[in-house]
């Protein structure tokens, strides 16, 4: 058997199936590899075995070799432990970003090279182009499916060794191709959410690792509204799962999470989705990663997303001495959440991004002050 030049990450879904089919149709020397990133915990919520069988079937139809690698230990150590630590610290992490950086474009890429390949391919909706003497990460043609947000931590080395064969396709086109070519995954439902949680209640899953720490739910005026099981089970802007019944002298309107204070174990809520406590015009990030290797300038304008599938928001970015960013938005932003990813764009090009550290939302400023006081006491 000839040594494959490209190893395709086969997830068992329609996207990676069509990615492999397109490369195979171009007579590229390819093989497929299925990654197991989570060990089934007995709840039957992670469909890894079903996905593996589908990946095997597609590789068989295409006549390409199939490989399997278990990265569950690496995933636990490099993604999941960070995921838990962030929630324990009251932040809302994005494990997909870390999984791409540490697993798919690190361990998987290393494995592909061990198998003799010099490139990898995945079913991501994104594009890579080379011009002006460097590699550029671009949005996928289907803006509703674009995944460049989750790929912003990639650099020049990874892009040089990566192919995104379906980045120029719309999802509907892709499914039609899969159906026309007889791929068994053509009608398979898209995966959503995080595999290790599946269809389970998120809070119940998190309780297995972060035991409940009940505390008070208060409104912006510090009036007690109800009790919560743990502030780390909630995120800014959340409406569901608060279990707040009728409150005396309050209208029967829904409540929204507007802030959390770990130092006092208080969860703050308000009855207005457009509450001023959910609005911010400024954020500071942790040190940023740049796809090109460096920022465009010490200060520059671009657009940003602070959550996946958000519309582009114009902003001014200032790079601080430690590599972190100060970002001033042209318009007020809703529920900008520490722990989530800030991703920067110049048109369709993804420049890079960073983890959001703090904002100028009123309760976030209070949280930062209380946290600083707590740290000073501990010191």
UniProtKB/Swiss-Prot annotation:
Q: Where is this site: Interaction with tRNA?
A: 124, 340
**Tagged with keyword Disulfide bond:** yes
Q: Name one GO cellular component term.
A: cytoplasm
Q: Where are the residues of the annotated region Interaction with tRNA?
A: 145-147, 307-308
Disulfide partners: 99-195
Q: Which InterPro entries match?
A: MnmA-like, MnmA-like_C, MnmA-like_central, MnmA-like_central_sf, Rossmann-like_a/b/a_fold
Q: Where is the active site?
A: 99, 195
Q: Which reaction does it catalyse?
A: S-sulfanyl-L-cysteinyl-[protein] + uridine(34) in tRNA + AH2 + ATP = 2-thiouridine(34) in tRNA + L-cysteinyl-[protein] + A + AMP + diphosphate + H(+)
Location of the region described as Interaction with target base in tRNA in the Swiss-Prot/TrEMBL record:
94-96
Database matches in SUPFAM superfamilies: Adenine nucleotide alpha hydrolases-like
> Per the UniProt entry, what are the Gene Ontology biological process annotations, in alphabetical order?
tRNA wobble position uridine thiolation
- In its keyword annotation, does this UniProt entry include ATP-binding? yes
Name the coiled-coil region(s). Answer: none
Keyword terms: ATP-binding, Cytoplasm, Disulfide bond, Nucleotide-binding, RNA-binding, Transferase, tRNA processing, tRNA-binding
Q: Where in the cell is it found?
A: Cytoplasm
Checking Gene3D superfamilies in the record gives: Adenine nucleotide alpha hydrolases-like domains (2.30.30.280), HUPs (3.40.50.620), Translation factors (2.40.30.10)
EC assignment: the record states: 2.8.1.13
User: What would be an example GO MF term here?
Assistant: tRNA binding
By sequence similarity, the record places it as follows: Belongs to the MnmA/TRMU family.
Which purpose does this protein serve, as stated in its record? Catalyzes the 2-thiolation of uridine at the wobble position (U34) of tRNA, leading to the formation of s(2)U34.
Q: What is this protein called?
A: tRNA-specific 2-thiouridylase MnmA
Q: Which organism is it from?
A: Xylella fastidiosa (strain Temecula1 / ATCC 700964)
Tell me the gene name: mnmA
């Amino acid at each position: 058997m000839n040594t494959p030049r490209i190893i395709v990450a086969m997830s068992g879904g329609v996207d990676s199936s069509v990615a492999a089919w397109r490369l195979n149709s171009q007579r590229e020397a390819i093989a497929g590899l299925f990654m197991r990133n989570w060990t089934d915990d007995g709840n039957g919520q992670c469909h890894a075995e079903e996905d593996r069988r589908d990946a095997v079937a597609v590789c068989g139809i295409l006549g390409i070799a199939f490989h399997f690698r278990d990265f569950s230990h690496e995933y636990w150590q490099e993604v999941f432990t960070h995921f838990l630590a962030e929630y324990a610290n009251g932040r809302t992490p994005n494990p997909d970003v870390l999984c791409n950086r540490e697993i798919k474009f690190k361990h998987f890429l290393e494995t592909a090279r061990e198998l003799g390949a010099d490139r990898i391919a995945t079913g991501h909706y994104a594009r890579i182009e080379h011009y002006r003497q460097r590699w550029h990460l671009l949005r996928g043609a289907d803006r509703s499916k674009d995944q460049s947000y989750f790929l912003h931590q990639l650099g020049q080395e990874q892009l040089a060794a990566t192919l995104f064969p379906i980045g120029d396709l719309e999802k509907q086109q892709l499914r039609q191709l899969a159906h026309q070519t007889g791929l068994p995954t053509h009608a398979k439902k898209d995966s959503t959410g995080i595999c290790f949680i599946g269809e389970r209640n998120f809070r119940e899953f998190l309780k297995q690792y972060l035991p409940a720490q009940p505390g008070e739910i208060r409104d912006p005026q510090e009036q007690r509204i109800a009790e919560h099981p743990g502030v780390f089970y909630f995120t800014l802007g959340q409406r569901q799962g608060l279990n707040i019944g009728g409150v005396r002298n309050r209208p029967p309107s829904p409540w929204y999470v507007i802030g959390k204070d770990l130092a006092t174990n208080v969860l703050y809520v308000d009855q207005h989705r457009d509450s001023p406590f959910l609005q911010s015009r400024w954020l500071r990030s942790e040190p940023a990663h740049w796809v090109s290797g460096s920022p465009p300038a010490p200060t520059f304008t671009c657009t940003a997303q602070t959550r996946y599938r958000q519309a582009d928001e114009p902003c001014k970015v200032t790079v601080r001495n430690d590599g972190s960013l100060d970002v001033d938005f042209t318009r007020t932003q809703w529920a900008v959440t520490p722990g989530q990813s800030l991703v920067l764009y110049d048109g369709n090009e993804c420049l890079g991004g960073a983890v959001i550290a703090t904002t100028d939302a009123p309760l976030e400023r209070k949280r930062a002050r209380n946290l600083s006081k707590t740290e000073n006491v501990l010191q």
